[in-house]
């Protein structure tokens, strides 16, 4: 509510401490202007996306604005000030997933207390559940590196396909695509290597549905 209060903002800057600026009920021009006032004083700023409506209905939460602020102010810390009803804490969880680095929400020991703050605040149970969820999300997110995990080894061995004979192949025959198919498990020649098999010569008779191995073929001399 004080984002347009230039004297107050400049007074806060005199403490030379980072300022956390909530953007509730403001537009981008007002945010830009307040940021410029703070920048002119040489003080760092964190911006919190916020909807100043108690409680904030889900359709007004507009959490994508967190990403919008990150794009508009790439050098700032961006967070979220939440006024939705706690429920399962989905708003804060989503804000965290969208990159919010600061999360702020009212806290109370009793949601039934009178006043305009307690009924939409989180309590200790909400906070504990939120913490557990974030810890699990951190585990689920993992890292940006794609590699085959040890836990996937059985799947790689048994769910992948191997080349097999689609029909009986007599010794001396040149291998063509029509002679081949692929089936589980993946213990034999991978279909990824089919080009190395095509054109080879069968050393011995190969029975229909037989798993192919490299020693079954010789290079064509053509």
PLM ranges: what are they?
Residues 1-222:
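Catalytic cores and adjacent flexible loops of soluble metabolic enzymes
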């Amino acid at each position: 509510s004080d984002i347009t209060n230039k004297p107050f903002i400049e007074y806060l800057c005199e403490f030379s401490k980072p300022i956390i600026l909530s953007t509730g009920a403001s537009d981008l021009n007002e945010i830009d202007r307040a940021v410029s006032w703070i920048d002119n004083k040489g003080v760092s700023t964190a911006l919190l996306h916020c909807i100043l409506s108690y409680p904030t209905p889900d359709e007004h939460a507009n959490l994508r604005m967190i990403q919008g602020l990150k794009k508009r102010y790439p050098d700032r810390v961006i967070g979220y000030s939440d006024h939705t009803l706690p429920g399962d804490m989905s708003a804060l969880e989503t804000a965290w997933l969208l990159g919010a680095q600061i999360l702020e929400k009212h806290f109370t020991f009793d949601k039934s207390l009178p006043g305009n703050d307690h009924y939409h605040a989180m309590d200790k149970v909400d906070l504990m559940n939120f913490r557990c969820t974030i810890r699990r999300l951190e585990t689920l997110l993992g890292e940006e590196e794609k590699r085959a995990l040890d836990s996937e080894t059985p799947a790689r061995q048994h769910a992948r396909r191997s080349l097999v004979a689609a029909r009986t192949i007599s010794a001396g025959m040149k291998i063509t695509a029509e002679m081949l198919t692929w089936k589980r498990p993946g213990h034999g020649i991978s279909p990824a290597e089919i080009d190395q098999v095509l054109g080879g010569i069968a050393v011995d008779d190969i029975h229909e549905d037989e798993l192919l191995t490299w020693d079954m073929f010789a290079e064509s001399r053509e």
